[in-house]
Amino acid sequence: MDVTTQTKLTREEWNSIELPVPTEELSILQFIRQGFHDPTRKENAMKSMYTYLKIDPNPALDHYLCQTFTSIPMKKMTIPLKKADQIRIQSKQVPDTVYEKVLLSLCAKGEFFHVEWMLRLAVSKPNPFVIAYVRECLAKHTPDMVQWTKDAVQLLERNPYVSYKDRELYAHQKELFTVAKEAGSKLILYVAPTGTGKTMSPIGLSEKYHIIFVCAAKHVSMALAKMCLSLQIKVAFALGCKGEEDIKLHYSAAIDYVKNKKTGGIAKVDNTNGAKVEVMISDVQSYLYAMQYMMRFQPKEKILLYWDEPTIAMDVEEHPLHPIINKLWKENVIPNVVLSSATLPAMDYSALTTCTIYKIQNGESNKTIQLVNPNHQLILPHHLPYEEIPKVVAHLEAHGDLLKYVDLGSVVAFLKGRTPFTKASELTIPAIKQYYVTLLATMTREEWEAEQKKRIVVPSTIRFCSEDAWTCSHGPSIYIAEDVQKIASYCLKTAAIPASLLQELTKQLSYNQSLSEKMGQLEKDLEDSNKDSDKEKKMTDNRVSPEVKKIQEELKRLQVSVHTIALPNGYVPNTYDHLLRYGVLDKQAMAFTSDVDASTIEKVLTTDIDASWKVLLMMGIGVFSAEAPPRYMELVKEQVMKQKMYVVLATSDYIYGTNYQFANLYLGKDMRLSQEKLIQTLGRVGRGKQVPYSIRFRDDAFATVLFTPQESPEARIMLRLFS
């Protein structure tokens, strides 16, 4: 089954969206929501002396705090300090992590690049005497821009103070929220790199519009639904619909419903009244029903169609979604539309609409993601054939987002001490890489030939279940291939689990599987037995029929009979025993290992999947496949979301919108991808904090597809379907 198949929500999916997002993510979502009203808003969590002491500034305190908690020479106070203020801060200490003390420490160490960077932060209530003193220190220092450029990896990529950075909207979000407030009908072409909050942007837009969020891949929609519910945004679902009657309201959006007389909760919802719905989650098939439904409660001018990844299924000439997409576009009457993607095709959109067209495209990224070829060499644009370099330059100038796949350290080496920068604020990762592209345009053949002899080789990464496992560092990895079963078999083979141990594991798994099948039948029998009875009343009174009681007792007996199965740590990648086995204990600090809890392993072991997948799960390896049972998929997704899995093996179905954080990606040699789909694939990596990310190509051809202009099947097919 293709994941773009339009289906209703399963019980597991309903349950999964009810789980709240982590606290840090919730804070980001709240900021985006508030940011719609003030796109320029910034905030910084770093404490100043005032915010740490929880007191309000005044001139006397400015002087007193600077004199008391810093070593800055101060003149005698001329403004008397109020007795109440003196008592409030008496005997209190200020830690070295407050803003002013960090600034002074950096000045003392001569780290003036970081001083300049930190002076630009939006820290609340900084001490003016400290700021003035620091600026005086800076004025006496002449920046060495050549050296700072050479040190860019340490200063920018490995900036130890990056955790202090301001929280603000991405540039593309600021522009989107500004354009969305413009009067009149509009088509917004919203293009931004993956992992920069595009799927979160509808949350901000919901402050002005009632949103119909459409995506062909259900797991993308589920991610947004979960975020909305965590913010108490009222949602409804139009998934797998054959009519408006199939639309379902979340309880929070229900107006008319029948209460459970015993519990006081909602027993039955009238799904026809959606007047409270703020965000409608829809698939492509159900959109027109969702549109008509929403228009019964809101004028169409107050509704916005947010179509995420509209080019899904447009990389092939024929697809079951094509006629549905064509009908959607022709019959849509919602005047405000956002087409959101990392890779909207370059084409003339004026032929598709009479609305005002706005194009939002921001490709800047502070991330660096290394590309590695099958020979374990780093890939840079100048490693492509010399004849291709002019095309490469033009392509990179038009698609700045691709520069995040250009290794910063390699670029700095390429510059050989050259720098166009004159002040610290100009020295950024995007600016350095753009300068690299400028130099690339003037590269001679002799220079190109010299660079080919300087290829940087990195450690082998392919045997990631054995001696190379430590290279899967800093977070979970994902391996994308069409034939995931082949990769799964490779994992088991290279893990070198002894045949005797595998035989015993298979025996135990087979035993548990037989119990699982029996329990599955009993659960079905239990459900059937309850169908014709007044279950609600009987369960409340703790009274069940003898037949039901017998089934329940048998279920309990089988559940306790399930064997606990564990794989020795020596075969679980990057555990202490595994690293010791391969003699790489010195890599323990960077190596990432799984941390799947015992209850999840137990649940997976009783799931109806291939025994090899169960062994892989014990190794910390999950499989994303449309063929996998929903229960298994939800269990694995939950562990991936929590950063508990070591590696995920995934088919191309999961290229779009897998909004989990991966540090490394393997791209299988059996993948055949258009440029747009390749960029979507690479976007699975680099969504988290600033750590060393990597993408390991198993075919050299991917670099050419990425860095040179390519014919776009998506553009041709979109033009056909939207006309």
Role assignments for model-derived ranges:
Residues M1-S723:
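N-terminal helicase ATP-binding lobe
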